[in-house]
Structures are given as C-alpha cells and as structure tokens.
Curated annotation (Swiss-Prot):
Its cofactor is [4Fe-4S] cluster. Pfam families: Oxidored_q6. NDH-1 is composed of 14 different subunits. Subunits NuoB, C, D, E, F, and G constitute the peripheral sector of the complex. Keywords: 4Fe-4S, Cell membrane, Iron, Iron-sulfur, Membrane, Metal-binding, NAD, Quinone, Translocase, Transport. This is NADH-quinone oxidoreductase subunit B 1. InterPro entries: NADH_UbQ_OxRdtase-like_20kDa, NADH_UQ_OxRdtase_20Kd_su. The keyword NAD applies. The keyword Ribonucleoprotein does not apply. GO terms for molecular function: 4 iron, 4 sulfur cluster binding; iron ion binding; NADH dehydrogenase (ubiquinone) activity; NADH:ubiquinone reductase (non-electrogenic) activity; quinone binding. Binds 1 [4Fe-4S] cluster. It is found in: Cell membrane.
C-alpha cells in the first residue's frame, strides 16, 4: 500500500548505494606508509602542481584510526611487515590499500631474504601501481580507479562478508618467490 510497493524492485537500495558511494569516494582520507623513493613521488601529489585536495584528500593522516586508504610506497622489510599489518588492522572499515611501485608490489630488484616479496601477503591490496618510482600522474590515475571501485561497492552485511573472504584469499596466495619458474 506504500510507496515501496509501487517502485521497481531494488530502486531505493540502488539509489542509496549510489549516494553512499559518491560520499565515500569524495571523502577518502589517506594514511601514508612511505618507506623508500616512492614516498617522494607520493608527497609530490599533495603539492600544488598535482593538487590531491581536488579529489577530497586534503591531508595525509598520521593516525591509522583517522584513515581509510593506505598507500604503501616502497619496499617492505621483514621487520616492517608486522608494523604494516598492525597499522592496517587499526584502520576503520571500509579500508583500501594501494601498493605503489614495484618494490611494494613484488619486492622489486630486492629479491632477498630481508624484503617481503609483495605487500599483498601482509595486507589485501586493491590497486597495484607499477613503476620505479611511479610518476604522480600514475598515482592520481590509481586513486581515480579506486574512486570508481569505491563508488560501485556494495553496502551492508554482504559487503563485510565479501571483504573478509577477499582478504583471506589474498593472504593465502603463494608468494612470488615460491612460484616455480617465474623468477628463474
């Protein structure tokens, strides 16, 4: 008898999800995890020439409790891996990760025991950004792609279950160093 009976199926929920997606993508707060030369390029995107503020990212947050995007920029050592995971766990949901540069994505040229061969074995990664180091324009493009992903993401209980399953699947994947024939 009400308005919801006259609307097509899924109309109201779709509209709410689109509005919430627009709000979430327009107010992403990044936390920096700059570990090497990629961090210099990441800092450049916040300067006047590239102006990251026009995408709703005014200030890089110093506290993970105030951030929902982690940009891992540079190589991650074995000693830094637990700290990276702790910072990720302290971030509120929903949270996203950009792996910036080949060192963060695959260990880069540092194929040894001290460097983690891909940050995706510590935290689930949403966007991989190649380059050594990637240009600020590439980081802006990755952020825009993440905005598209955020805007189309689902809300509610199903979203939490999907995020949990995706994180478990990402962390169970084989490290690159153990993939036979790939690095030899």
């Amino acid at each position: 008898m009400g308005l919801e009976e006259k609307l097509p199926s899924g109309f109201v929920l779709t509209t709410v999800e689109q509005a919430a997606g627009w709000v979430r993508k327009s107010s992403v707060f990044p936390a920096t995890f700059g570990l090497a030369c990629c961090a210099i390029e990441m800092m450049t995107t916040g300067a006047g020439r590239y102006d990251l503020a026009r995408f709703g990212m005014e200030v890089f947050r110093g506290s993970p409790r105030q951030a929902d995007l982690m940009i891992v920029a540079g190589r991650v050592s074995q000693k830094m891996a637990p700290v990276l995971r702790q910072v990720y766990d302290q971030m509120p949901n929903p949270k996203w990760v950009i792996s910036m540069g080949v060192c963060a994505s695959s260990g880069g040229m540092f194929n040894n025991y001290a460097i983690v061969q891909g940050v995706d074995h510590i935290v689930p990664v949403d966007i991989y950004l190649p380059g050594c180091p990637p240009r600020p324009e590439m980081l802006l493009d990755a952020i825009l792609k993440l905005h598209q992903k955020i805007q189309t993401s689902k809300l509610g209980v199903n979203a939490e279950e999907a995020a949990r399953e995706a994180e478990e699947a990402a962390l169970k994947a084989l490290p690159l160093i153990e993939m036979k024939g790939l690095l030899r």
